[in-house]
């Protein structure tokens, strides 16, 4: 069994914001798997699905970004899962917009949701699907930038990016992060 976590903030006011791209990917992954978010546990919405041979719980913390790790840590402990069973999808300021990259471990890059997950699972050594949102314009607060909505003209790019992130997540679940990284990151570089 695997746990896939989409990071975001609950509430309609955060829909379509850069910071909520993890929720968008989680929603699309559940939709493609024929699952829906009907369960509520660990202060999160949950959907049970199958990705290939793997049973997967897709989790969207409802604690707001800075406390996302509470739900993730509770779910890992409840199902007795290890860090190699965890895939977290989140926005990333350090990646150019609409670029998808898979990595294991590393720093949180100032992302408070990732920082919270690291603290509550005890390590950064888990798979992360990073979805690039780019850097804010000069003199703009990064918090305001990530809480800003994608422009209407970015819909096609966002949709394609979400599909790429869903595929990266699926590969991480089915193949394991190490094998999946080669495929995902090679595709991401080729798209440049």
UniProtKB/Swiss-Prot annotation:
SUPFAM superfamilies: Peptidyl-tRNA hydrolase-like. The record marks 9 as: Discriminates between blocked and unblocked aminoacyl-tRNA. The record marks 91 as: Stabilizes the basic form of H active site to accept a proton. TRNA binds at residues 14, 64, 66, 112. Its main location: cytoplasm. It is found in: Cytoplasm. The active site is at 19 (proton acceptor). One of its GO terms (biological process) is rescue of stalled ribosome. Hydrolyzes ribosome-free peptidyl-tRNAs (with 1 or more amino acids incorporated), which drop off the ribosome during protein synthesis, or as a result of ribosome stalling. This is Peptidyl-tRNA hydrolase. It comes from Anaeromyxobacter dehalogenans (strain 2CP-C). The gene is pth.
